[in-house]
Regions:
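Central beta-strand plus flanking loop segment that forms part of the substrate or channel wall
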Residues: 154-189
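N-terminal FAD cofactor-binding segment of flavoenzymes
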Residues: 33-81
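Beta1/beta-strand and adjacent pyrophosphate-binding region of the FAD-binding site
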Residues: 1-12
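Conserved FAD/dinucleotide-binding core of flavoprotein oxidoreductases
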Residues: 192-266
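Glycine-rich FAD pyrophosphate-binding loop
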Residues: 7-9, 18-42
């Protein structure tokens, strides 16, 4: 039985901690907020999750909302200008439904479960001194927080990080009075080329079902207008204006005017997509092992963040449960590389969506308009971006793939 400390009680940290407790290990968890404080705070994510990641939660018995929350069973992508002229549209069914649970509901419940299983939950702002104490009293220290002094422990890996600054200005909103699109509930990706994106899907929040959407503005463009926004109502008003101005087809879903689900249902920010080295050395020489966003963070444009957290937690959990030796740097790096074998596809998948699409990518997306099987493959790529390798990521493989589909038609 190992003693393991986890700093950060989010999707990855709690998932891993609960799994380790179920596997017979002793676990200390550090959170800077209580469950009650999380529940009473601002939204933290859009947390769109799909079949594989939800399945990992189900394995641990922590999928408490599987039957009571809205689900979406399709994905669609539309590229259109500000006048609503459509240049691209496809929709495909998902093999397994997606779901989004407000983390203000989810994390407090998981914290309760962690303690029910015998975990030691510490409420504190973790600093370097605390990390040193935890490293000295535990067999393994895992950092699941990518913010502040602790987040800076892990050095950027330039070979795996093509960007040095944010590629989008982000504005997240939970709303009512935004009708679902006709047909199957879907995650809807809308692109206004050169301006930005609008992503929406159903979710469950504090007062029940809602719609969750993110506006992704290209920095310096006409939707990059958030610096003077101060209040939640200002945020909502700007969101509705941008929706009407730049995504008129989606604006047709508004019933009168949008309403916030609550006065803390907004979030703004900028993320620089970054992959870091997973092992950090503390001043004492002790090691810290980073997980999920602490060492591999993507822009939310493809809805991969919470999925990555669950998948990284699954890889780490399996590796820890199978290990009977010291948790040294060699083991840490090998464990992360197991995760990276999957995560590298997520990084490419997301980064390709942030930049002007290469010709082969446009050929695939255009082909999906008239090829229902290809549209389904693209819809299910949200669940597993690796499943569309190599043909989505490599122009030569894309040509071969499309030629084979044409010959088979």
């Amino acid at each position: 039985m190992a003693k393991i400390a986890i700093v950060g009680a989010g999707q990855a940290g709690l998932h891993l901690g609960i799994g380790l407790l179920a596997g017979g290990h002793q676990v200390t968890m550090v959170s800077n907020r209580t469950g009650a404080e999380i529940a009473a705070g601002f939204v933290t994510s859009s947390q769109s999750m799909y079949g594989m990641a939800l399945g990992f939660e189900r394995e641990l018995g922590i999928d408490y909302w599987q039957d009571g929350a809205p689900q979406y069973r399709a994905a669609q992508m539309r590229a259109a200008d500000s006048e609503g002229h459509v240049g691209l549209f496809w929709q495909g069914d998902m093999e397994e439904p997606g779901q989004s649970i407000d983390q203000r509901i989810k994390m407090p419940r998981w914290m309760d479960r962690f303690e029910e299983l015998g975990g030691d939950l510490i409420i504190a702002d973790a600093d370097m001194a605390m990390l040193e104490r935890l490293a000295g009293s535990h067999d393994l220290l895992i950092v699941a927080s990518g913010k502040g002094e602790i987040g800076r422990l892990f050095e950027r890996n330039p070979a795996r990080s093509p960007f040095t600054q944010p590629q989008r200005v982000l504005a997240l909103t939970y709303v009512h009075r935004f009708r679902p699109r006709p047909g199957k509930p879907a995650i809807c990706i809308n692109i206004n080329p050169g301006i930005g994106e609008f992503v929406s899907f159903p979710g469950l929040t504090l007062d029940g079902p809602c719609e969750i959407f993110t506006i992704e503005a290209i920095p310096g463009g006409p939707m990059d207008c958030w610096d003077e926004v101060r209040t939640a109502q200002d945020h909502l008003a700007v969101s509705e204006r941008l929706l009407r101005d730049f995504f008129p087809i989606e604006a047709e879903r508004i019933e009168g005017h949008l309403e916030l689900t609550d006065d803390k249902a907004v979030l703004r920010g900028r993320i620089t997509p970054t992959t870091r080295h997973p092992v950090a050395t503390l001043p004492s020489g002790a090691l810290a092992f980073g997980i999920a966003d602490a060492v591999c963070v993507n822009d939310p444009i493809t809805g991969q963040g919470s999925n990555n957290a669950a998948k990284c937690a699954k890889v780490y959990l399996d590796a820890i449960l199978a290990h009977d030796g010291p948790f040294d740097a060699q083991w840490m790096n090998a464990t992360f590389e197991t995760y990276w074998d999957y995560a590298r596809y997520v990084v490419d998948y997301t980064n390709m969506t942030l930049t002007p699409p290469p010709p082969h990518m446009m050929q695939i997306l255009k082909a999906a308009e008239t090829d229902p099987t290809l549209a389904r493959l693209m819809a299910n790529s949200f669940n597993d971006p690796k499943a569309i390798a190599p043909w989505y990521y490599d122009p030569v493989e894309a040509d071969r793939f499309l030629s084979e589909r044409t010959q088979a038609a």
